[in-house]
């Protein structure tokens, strides 16, 4: 277990141990605070050493659960499994039906407005990838992160079938938008699914089939392997 540390300018430094953080707080050298449920300390004095090691974030996207790991060569600082955003599609449908009801009451012969089409991501797709980006933004504020290692998921296509994802996929558009925004925070390294499996087998780790289970072997095992593939360590 480690405690994230930031300096007086809110810049992230290398995490410290809980015992050292406690001594800093008791002596007045640091102030405790919480950042999205994570206990952190803010230094009130000039740090003796501001050098940072290479820290990577492993990201394992999923349809129901997602894994995030913050790791350096020597230590694993954070392993979290979050719930993916799955409620936006139903919320948008309810909003659409209520709006349709209001329009029918007021203007029963209303014609379609064909000049209001807009580009961009659909609300449900945008919410899914914005959620991942917000988590990465919060981690970047408390850890000296240099690189994000992401498993590059693919959309399923159907040969000789007229499906919406044969020529267009919200998944592909959403992840490309996410990668573009993530590059503003640091270096982005992509790994294919089979590469993640090879790395996992090389380290002798197992992944369970129950992806919604609240255990390390569900999603965090892959996010840990992805981060470890960049910085190394065990």
Where are these regions (language model features)?
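Low-complexity, highly charged intrinsically disordered N-terminal segments
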Residues: 1-17, 28
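Hydrophobic residues embedded in beta-strands of well-ordered beta-sheets
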Residues: 3, 30, 38-41, 66, ...
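A generic structural motif
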Residues: 6, 46, 69-71
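Charged, flexible boundary elements
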Residues: 16-51
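Substrate-contacting helices/loops that form the catalytic groove of nucleic-acid
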Residues: 50, 71-234
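Gly/Thr-rich phosphate-binding beta-strand-loop-beta motif of the actin/hexokinase/Hsp70
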Residues: 53-72
């Amino acid at each position: 277990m480690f405690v994230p540390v930031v300096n007086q300018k809110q810049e992230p430094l290398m995490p410290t141990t809980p015992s050292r953080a406690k001594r800093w707080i008791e002596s007045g050298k640091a102030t405790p605070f919480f950042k999205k449920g994570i206990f952190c300390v803010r230094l009130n004095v000039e740090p003796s050493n501001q050098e940072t090691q290479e820290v990577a974030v492993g990201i394992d996207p999923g349809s129901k659960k997602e894994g995030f790991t913050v790791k350096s060569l020597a230590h694993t600082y954070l392993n979290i499994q979050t719930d993916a955003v799955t409620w936006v599609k139903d919320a948008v449908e309810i909003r659409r039906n209520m709006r349709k009801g209001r329009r029918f009451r007021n203007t029963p012969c209303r014609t379609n407005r064909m000049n209001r089409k807009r580009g961009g991501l659909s609300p449900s797709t945008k919410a899914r990838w914005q959620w991942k980006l917000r988590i990465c933004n919060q981690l970047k504020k408390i850890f000296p992160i240099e690189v994000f290692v992401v498993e590059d998921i693919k959309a399923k296509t159907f040969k000789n079938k007229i499906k919406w994802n044969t020529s267009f996929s919200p998944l592909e558009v959403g992840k490309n938008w996410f990668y573009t925004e993530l590059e503003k925070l640091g270096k982005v390294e992509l790994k294919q699914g089979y590469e993640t499996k090879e790395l996992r087998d090389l380290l002798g780790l197992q992944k369970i089939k129950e992806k919604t289970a609240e255990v390390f072997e569900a999603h965090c095992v892959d996010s840990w392997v992805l981060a470890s593939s960049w910085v190394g360590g065990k």
